[in-house]
């Protein structure tokens, strides 16, 4: 009985370690994408349509905190991320 509890505890511990490692890997990917984003010189916006008109050289663009944020990096169509501004 005690052995089965120890085995179950070890199994749960190993699964939680795998889950933490997977979450950490995803966080690294997101931070790489955020580093690729830049605030466009075009300036302020009220919605994404304004950024689409002003940031023609960008591949992905969004209006965040009333600033056009764009990425010149190519993302496959199914994995295009939501862009965020990283505070320094």
Swiss-Prot record:
The keyword NAD does not apply. GO terms for biological process: defense response to fungus; killing of cells of another organism. Its main location: secreted. Disulfide bonds join 45-63, 51-68, 55-70. One of its GO terms (cellular component) is extracellular region. It is found in: Secreted. Keywords: Antimicrobial, Disulfide bond, Fungicide, Plant defense, Secreted, Signal. The keyword Secreted applies. Residues 1-23 form the signal peptide. Belongs to the DEFL family. This is Defensin-like protein 267. It comes from Arabidopsis thaliana. The lineage of its organism: Eukaryota, Viridiplantae, Streptophyta, Embryophyta, Tracheophyta.
């Amino acid at each position: 009985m005690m052995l089965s509890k120890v085995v179950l505890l070890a199994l749960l511990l190993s699964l939680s370690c795998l889950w933490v490692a997977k979450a950490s890997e995803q966080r690294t990917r997101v931070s790489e994408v955020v580093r690729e984003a830049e605030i466009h010189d075009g300036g302020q916006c009220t919605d994404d349509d304004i950024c689409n008109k002003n940031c023609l050289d960008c591949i992905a663009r969004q209006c965040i905190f009333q600033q056009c944020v764009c990425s010149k990096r190519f993302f496959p169509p199914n994995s295009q991320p939501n862009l965020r501004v990283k505070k320094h």
